[in-house]
Design a protein with these regions (language model features):
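Boundary/entry segment of secreted carbohydrate-active catalytic domains
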Residues: 38-79, 94
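Short helix-terminating capping/connector loops at secondary-structure junctions
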Residues: 47-48, 160-162, 194-197, 269-273, ...
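Active-site regions of enzymes building and remodeling cell-envelope glycoconjugates
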Residues: 70-74, 84-98, 104-109
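Extracellular/luminal regions of secreted and cell-surface proteins that mediate adhesion/ECM remodeling
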Residues: 368-506
C-alpha cells in the first residue's frame, strides 16, 4: 500500500465485513510499477480547467492530466520540482507524524528541503497536513495540530509572502470532526493569543461510517473514518455519523456537508474565504455490493462524478460563498485517484496508462464545458484621509479588488482604471491604467491609486476592468463597480462597533 493514500487503512478495516455484504471475494492489490508517460498532452494549455483536479498517486500519469481537462493536482507530498505539464497547478502538502517528544510532531519535508521547495513553488497553495483527524493518517490532537500549524504557517509565509496557507483536510465535514476543528481554533487562540490565520480551508468529502474502533475493533460497523484521536477515549463519542455502503455516493449527503462546512467557516470568522475540496470519490471496488445488492460499477461511479461536478460548478450562496468567485461554494476540487486500483474511481489503467471508463467520463465531461474568463471589481473603497475637512482639498487613496471567476488555469490579462463618475457617461480617469494577470477560480489582486486635491463633497468613484485584446469576457455586465466617497465638513458622532474573536464553546 502506498503511504500517501489518505484513507487507506481505515477503509481496509472494513474489508472482512464488506466481503460478507457483497457475497463475493474482493482481490485487492497495489498498482504495479509502470513506465512513466511523457510530459506531453494533446490539449491546448489555455483549455485546462482550474476547478477540476486529480489526486495523482502515480507519477507516470501526471503528463496526461491536461488531457482530462484537469487544471491542478496534489500528490500527498511536497515536491521541490513537481511536474507541471501545460502549466497545470500543483498543491504541495506538508505531512505530519505524531511524536512522543516536544513539540509533539515531526513533519516532512523539513529544514533545507522545505526551504528549497517553498522557493521553487512561489505563490503555491500549501495544504498543512493530510487528514489530521484520521488515526490512520497524520493523526494529531487538536493541541498539537494548532502548534504545528502555527510553525508551518509562519515558516512558509516568511519564506514566501505570496504563498497561500490552508488548514483542514479533514476526512468529512461531520459534527465530531467540526468539533475537532473547534478545538484546534480554541487551542490556537489559547496558545498564541490570536485567531488562527488561514488563506482558505480544505476538506475531503467522503461519506464514511464513524464508529470508535478503539472500543470494539471487531464490531461489524467498525469501518470507514473512525473517530478523531481527541475523542477516542470519550464514551460520548462511540459513534459519529453512521452510514451504510448504499449511502457512500448519495449526492444529498455530499451537498449537505459542503453547506455545513461553509456555515462553520462563516460562524468561525472565515466567511468568504476559498474552500478547496482536495479529495473525494467512490472508494469501494466495483465487485462490492451495497445493502441493496447494487455494485459500484463504472456507470454508478460516473453518475456520482457527474452529479457532484454539476453541483460544485453551479452552487453559489451570497452569504456563505466566496465573493472573489461570484459567491461559489467550492473553488477547486480533486477526484481520487489516478491509478490506485485498491479503490474505485481510478482514472488511468496503472499498466497501460490509458484512461479507464471513469477517466474517459471525466474527460468527456470537461471537454464540452465553455472555457471562460470573467473579470470583475469585487469592491471599491477609499482611505488615507480624514472624513472631515475644514474646507480644504484632501488626498485620498482609492482601493479595489479585481477577481477572475472564470474557469481557466492559464492566467489572463486585463487593464483596470479608476474614474470620478461613470466611465460610460463622461467620468474622469483617476490615475493611470493598471494591469492585472489572473487565473480563474477566484484568483484576485488588490490595487490602489492616489487621488490628490479632492474638495469636500460626495463622489461616485467607479472602477472598470477591461480584458486584454483577444480575451473575451464571459460576463461584461460586471466589469464596472461603483463606490460612494464623502469628504464632509460637519461632525456626526456614531458608535464604534468592534468585532472580537471568541473561542467556540466546547
Amino acid at each position: 500500500m502506498k503511504e500517501y493514500r489518505t484513507t487507506l487503512l481505515y477503509v481496509l478495516l472494513a474489508m472482512v465485513f464488506l466481503v460478507l455484504v457483497a457475497g463475493g471475494t474482493a482481490v485487492l492489490y497495489a498498482a504495479p510499477n509502470s513506465q512513466a508517460a511523457p510530459e506531453t498532452s494533446t490539449i491546448n494549455p489555455d483549455d485546462i480547467l482550474c476547478r477540476f483536479g486529480v489526486n495523482a498517486v502515480e507519477g507516470g500519469t501526471v503528463g496526461s492530466l491536461p488531457d482530462l481537462g484537469a487544471g491542478w493536482y496534489m500528490n500527498f507530498t511536497a515536491q521541490s520540482n513537481p511536474s507541471r505539464p501545460e502549466g497545470i497547478e500543483y498543491m504541495p502538502v506538508i505531512r505530519f507524524q505524531p511524536s512522543p517528544v516536544s513539540p509533539g510532531y515531526t513533519y516532512t519535508p523539513s529544514g533545507t528541503a522545505l526551504q528549497q521547495t517553498i522557493a521553487n513553488n512561489p505563490g503555491a497553495k500549501w495544504l498543512v497536513s493530510n487528514e489530521p483527524d484520521s488515526v490512520w493518517q497524520d493523526n494529531l490532537t487538536a493541541d498539537v495540530y494548532a502548534r504545528a500549524y502555527n510553525e508551518l504557517y509562519h515558516l512558509i509565509k516568511s519564506a514566501d509572502p505570496t504563498a497561500r496557507v490552508v488548514p483542514g483536510s479533514i476526512i468529512q465535514a461531520t459534527p465530531v470532526r467540526l468539533l475537532y476543528l473547534d478545538r484546534i481554533l480554541t487551542s490556537y487562540y489559547n496558545q498564541f493569543h490570536t485567531p488562527l490565520p488561514a488563506d482558505g480551508w480544505s476538506i475531503h468529502n467522503y461519506i464514511l461510517n464513524e464508529e470508535n474502533c478503539a472500543v470494539d475493533p471487531g464490531e461489524p460497523g467498525c469501518w470507514g473514518a473512525d473517530i478523531p484521536r481527541d475523542f477516542r477515549n470519550d464514551p460520548a463519542w462511540l459513534y459519529g455519523e453512521v452510514w451504510g455502503l448504499k449511502d457512500t455516493d448519495r449526492l444529498e449527503i455530499f451537498v449537505e456537508r459542503i453547506m455545513r462546512f461553509r456555515q462553520w467557516m462563516a460562524n468561525r470568522g472565515y466567511r468568504g474565504l476559498p474552500l478547496y475540496l482536495t479529495e473525494y470519490g467512490v472508494l469501494f471496488p466495483e465487485d462490492y455490493a451495497d445493502e441493496n445488492g447494487q455494485k459500484f460499477t463504472p456507470a454508478r461511479v460516473n453518475t456520482f462524478m457527474n452529479l457532484t461536478f454539476n453541483y460544485m460548478r453551479a452552487a453559489t450562496d451570497p452569504v456563505l460563498g466566496d465573493p472573489n468567485d461570484e459567491y461559489r461554494m467550492v473553488q477547486q476540487w480533486s477526484w481520487y485517484s489516478t491509478t490506485d486500483v485498491t479503490y474505485n474511481g481510478v482514472l488511468f489503467d496503472p499498466i497501460t496508462l490509458q484512461p479507464t471508463a471513469i477517466g474517459t467520463n471525466y474527460a468527456s465531461y470537461t471537454a464540452v464545458l465553455n472555457r471562460e474568463v470573467d473579470f470583475y471589481p469585487v469592491s471599491v473603497s477609499a482611505g488615507g484621509f480624514s472624513a472631515l475637512s475644514q474646507g480644504e482639498p484632501v488626498t485620498a487613496t482609492l482601493r479595489t479588488r479585481i477577481a477572475n471567476s472564470g474557469n481557466l488555469t492559464a492566467p489572463a490579462a486585463a487593464a483596470v482604471r479608476f474614474y470620478n463618475g461613470s466611465p460610460s457617461s463622461g467620468g474622469v480617469p483617476i490615475g493611470p491604467a493598471q494591469n492585472v494577470t489572473l487565473s480563474g477560480c477566484g484568483e484576485f489582486q488588490s490595487l490602489s491609486v492616489t487621488w490628490p486635491n479632492v474638495p469636500p463633497g460626495r463622489y461616485s468613484v467607479y472602477v472598470q476592468v477591461t480584458p486584454a485584446a483577444g480575451i473575451t469576457d464571459a460576463d461584461t455586465s460586471n466589469n464596472v463597480a461603483m463606490g460612494q466617497i464623502v469628504v464632509g465638513t460637519h461632525h456626526t458622532f456614531l458608535p464604534t462597533v468592534q468585532h472580537l474573536f471568541l473561542p467556540p464553546e466546547q
